[in-house]
Amino acid sequence: MPTYVCAVPPKFLSDDQKNQIAAAISHRHGEATGAPSFFVQVVIEESWSARRYLGAEPADHHIWIRGDIRAGRPQEVRGRLMLSIMKDVSAIAKVREESIWVYLCNLEPTDMVEYGHVLPPPGKEQEWFESLPASLQAYLKGLGAKKETFRL
């Protein structure tokens, strides 16, 4: 359900760091919202053509994270989520916390289709999951079962 896009300079992160960041963001989202890990998509983009600037100076040691998430969660939950992602990514990437930018964009669940179905509002995941075809439920359980923290 959430999609987090991390924009990083090319060759800034190792493959292991990218894997750790994806795991950390997935974990933090689930921890904050209760959403199962198979809902969390993390994209790490390295672009040779994109140049980012701050104050007209190249910003070569910054990481930008944009999370498109379902609307309906309190500001307190969103604030904790952003700060925990910032701290985790800072530690993994070995950059200052001030170099991590996190933006959450709240989308209405009815404006999102994933796995072929319009998404439920927060707190209605179980009913949504139970309404899915058995084959899709099995597929999603398989994704979540790869993590020790799987729950629905």
What residue spans do the PLM features occupy?
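A domain-level signal for the structural core that forms small-molecule/cofactor-binding pockets
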Residues: M1-L152
